Regions:
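Glycosyltransferase specificity loop/lid
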Residues: 1-164
Length: 164
């Protein structure tokens, strides 16, 4: 029986958030899917970029995040996440549109796989009529915390700004 070279016939675009504990799970998933025959493109903000030399089989594309150094150095995690979601939507849309223009029919974009913290990615996927898959890179125990928040709010233990 002849061993045939596996041809990559479909591309997955991964959108990473540049935080510890989020990059590795996404790259691990990308590695598994690469082994199953998918081509992988990693799109990431310029801030805290992953080391592309650790995964030479992937295509890494940085996009502008327009994060001011003062915001990053202040360590305001929620502010950084909010700014990334606001600032990266346009650059991600432009990047994927360019990929679609140059698309090889044997290497078409099948899906955008994104970290749940980069929630703007679904809007980009919808706009470009591509499927989007949201991946929660947080431990399963955090799901329990999210489930309990409304109850804690109702009992007056915590409060939220705006609607819950």
């Amino acid at each position: 029986m002849e061993k045939q070279e596996q041809q990559k016939v479909s591309r997955l675009v991964f959108v990473l958030i540049p935080f510890q504990g989020h990059i590795n799970p996404m790259l691990q998933l990308a590695t598994i899917l690469y082994a199953k025959g998918f081509s992988i493109t990693i799109i990431h903000p310029q801030f805290n970029s992953p080391n592309s030399s650790n995964h030479p089989e992937f295509t890494f594309i940085p996009i502008s995040d327009n994060l001011p150094k003062s915001q990053v150095s202040a360590g305001d995690l929620f502010g950084i996440v909010s700014a990334l979601n606001k600032n990266c939507e346009g650059p991600l849309t432009e990047c994927i549109q360019e990929m679609l223009k140059a698309e090889d029919p044997h290497d078409r974009i099948s899906c955008i796989v994104y970290d749940s913290t980069m929630y703007f990615s679904q809007s980009v996927a919808d706009h470009l009529k591509l499927p989007g898959i949201c991946v929660r890179t947080s431990p399963a125990a955090t799901m329990l915390a999210f489930a309990v928040f409304p109850c804690l709010h109702e009992q007056g233990y915590i409060s939220f700004l705006g609607k819950v």
